[in-house]
């Protein structure tokens, strides 16, 4: 299926292609995915999911990471659910009862509004140095990611993404790395703000506990991160793509 770039978290800002193609995994691809997915390697997991998208459309290499993170979720969602709905069940942290909700891609998945000004980057002061920020595409990000994939000095994906926001990593790699990793006080606040601006573009989904509401009248809810929903393809397929009696007719 083709997704117009205007419907991505970036709004398609600066893209010279109108859409990207994302395909649901078929049966043999799901089996291969579950066999080959590097379960104990955080960096390997991210690279594996990224390569799955690139197989669908080479233009993914020119997409912003903020869009690619969403597309990783979208590919998994369209694999487990034909109508892009999803059954969520979490335990209420207050009463311990399960909270169940069917979320819809159209009505429940929302992006934080993008401001075109931030897409042009900014000048920042970090660790006593002045940097220009960029909005990294996959091609930009891989220049940074491949360094850490090789040497494994930093393995936290969010930290690597933060480092990738700085322009000229190829010229100032050690300085940028040190200024990000050793940030304190206001510099930490700055880096967290940059993460939210350039990566955390999906709104969380609030699930209201009806049991708590019924018992004391208070409205208690749990915030669920969209990206963390799909963890097991076959389990999620059973729940979100059930069959009825017409699918199997015994002789």
PLM ranges: what are they?
Residues 1-251:
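Long C-terminal interaction/binding lobes of large macromolecular proteins
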């Amino acid at each position: 299926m083709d997704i117009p770039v205007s419907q991505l978290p970036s709004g398609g800002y600066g893209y010279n292609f109108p859409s990207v193609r994302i395909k649901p995994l078929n049966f043999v691809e799901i089996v291969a995915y579950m066999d080959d997915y590097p379960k104990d390697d955080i960096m390997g997991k991210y690279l594996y999911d990224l390569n799955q998208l690139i197989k669908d459309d080479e233009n993914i290499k020119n997409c912003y990471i903020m869009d690619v993170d969403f597309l990783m979720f979208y590919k998994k969602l369209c694999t487990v659910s034909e109508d892009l709905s999803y059954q969520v069940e979490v335990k209420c942290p207050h009463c311990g009862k399960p909270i169940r909700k069917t979320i819809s891609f159209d009505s429940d998945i929302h992006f934080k509004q993008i401001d075109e000004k931030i897409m042009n980057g900014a000048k920042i002061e970090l660790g006593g140095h002045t940097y220009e920020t960029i909005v990294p595409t996959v091609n930009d990000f891989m220049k940074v990611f491949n360094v850490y994939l090789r040497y494994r000095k930093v393995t936290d994906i969010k930290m690597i993404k933060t480092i990738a926001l700085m322009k000229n990593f190829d010229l100032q790699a050690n300085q940028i790395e040190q200024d990000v990793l050793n940030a304190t006080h206001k510099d930490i606040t700055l880096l967290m703000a940059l993460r939210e601006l350039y990566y955390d573009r999906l709104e969380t989904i609030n699930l209201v506990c009806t049991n708590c509401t019924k018992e004391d009248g208070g409205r208690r809810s749990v915030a669920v991160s969209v990206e963390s929903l799909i963890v097991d393809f076959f389990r999620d397929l059973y729940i979100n793509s059930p069959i009825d009696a017409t699918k199997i007719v015994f002789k």
